[in-house]
A protein has these predicted regions:
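Internal helical hairpin/lid segments
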Residues: 227-279
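ATP/NTP phosphate-donor binding region
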Residues: 2-87, 98, 140
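Short amphipathic alpha-helical segments
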Residues: 41-43, 97-100, 126-128, 244-245
């Protein structure tokens, strides 16, 4: 519990939001500091000042752990908050949408979810035009409360215990090399601490990383049965891999990348960072309502930038349309 705290000026945490009027007007704000970053208290001070300058009534909780995020978002839901704002990145937002999807439809439809970008990866925030260094503009947009119902992707799989599981995602699922790179960065950062050093260390370890995986995929009427470098299934921009995806058309964009030559691999990274990823001849784009993964031998899987335990056997990735009320720029 050392990484969690609750701040609520009018009442203690155990009594939060007992009054119906207060539940309808006050925001529940969950602050997730960047892992390993300094200045978290200073960053929150700026956010708090901006909220008060804009006349926002709110209660504030903080957590740096996934378990804490889930518990505290569920606390907001159970106590009747109608506006929940995540100050964090893609992973924290993923926890929040999964908590909302665990609630009943009536409860979920009564809640609006907002986002102030503050994570290591803020791809979904950037998709909508929210920027880390434009705090005042972000708060003003959230105050306008312009709501759009958005889709969520969902991966359904069986775990190592034989249990049927599912996980929702707002941005993307990665299978293969990109997930392996994310895993390398997580491991090297745990050892090296610095984001820059972990990035350099990840690049060095890439020399020993396998670059393709035996996969069997079914996308629409196409069956792909061959070695594949990486697959991105995007509900939104997918860190540049599914740049044309939109989270409100009831469909998923899929980029399947075959194994290019080493020089072409570097070209692919260049096109990824310049927003022209689909122009690479090794990238094969699709648009679909469902992806069936019959086989992906030893391919790691990540959901919204966070590693998940590799599914056992075949699994499906699909979309659920207009299930979350999301506050977008006015």
């Amino acid at each position: 519990m050392a990484n969690e705290r609750v701040v609520s000026k009018p009442v203690p945490c155990s009594s939060l939001l007992k009054d119906e009027y207060m539940t309808n007007t006050r925001w529940g704000i969950l602050y997730c500091p960047k892992h390993g970053a300094t200045g978290a208290k200073k960053r929150w001070g700026k956010i708090e000042s901006c909220l008060r300058d804009n006349g926002i009534d709110f209660d504030f909780v903080q957590s740096e752990r996934q378990e804490g995020v889930v518990r505290l978002v569920n606390m907001f839901i159970d106590n009747g908050y109608k506006t929940i704002v995540i100050v964090g990145g893609d992973s924290a937002l993923n926890d929040a949408v999964n908590c909302l999807m665990s609630a009943s439809k009536d409860v979920r439809e009564s809640i609006a979810l907002g986002l102030i970008p503050n994570g290591v990866m803020n791809d979904f925030a950037h998709y909508w035009g929210f920027k880390e260094n434009e705090l005042e503009q972000t708060v003003k947009w959230l105050k306008e409360r312009r709501i759009r119902k958005i889709d969520l992707g969902c991966i359904r799989y069986v775990n190592a215990k034989g249990e049927k599981c599912h996980r929702y995602f707002h941005n993307c699922v990665n299978i293969g090399l990109i997930s392996a790179i994310m895993n390398l960065r997580r491991q090297t950062r745990r050892v090296l601490g610095s984001r820059t050093l972990s990035f350099i260390g990840s690049l060095a370890l890439m020399v020993f990383q396998r670059l393709d995986y035996k996969m069997s995929l079914k996308i629409n009427s196409d069956v792909i049965d061959r070695k594949v470098m990486t697959v991105c299934v995007g509900n939104a921009s997918g860190y540049g891999q599914t740049p044309n995806a939109v989270p409100y058309n009831g469909l998923l964009d899929v980029s399947v990348v075959y194994h290019p030559e080493m020089t072409q691999l570097f070209e692919g990274f260049y096109l990824l960072f310049t927003g022209k990823f689909l122009n690479h001849h090794s990238v094969h784009p699709y648009r679909t309502g469902e992806v069936i993964v019959n086989e992906a031998v030893r391919a790691l899987v990540s959901v919204d930038g966070r590693m998940m335990k590799t599914p056992v056997g075949p699994y499906k990735i699909m979309v659920e349309q207009e299930v979350i009320n999301f506050i977008i720029p006015a």
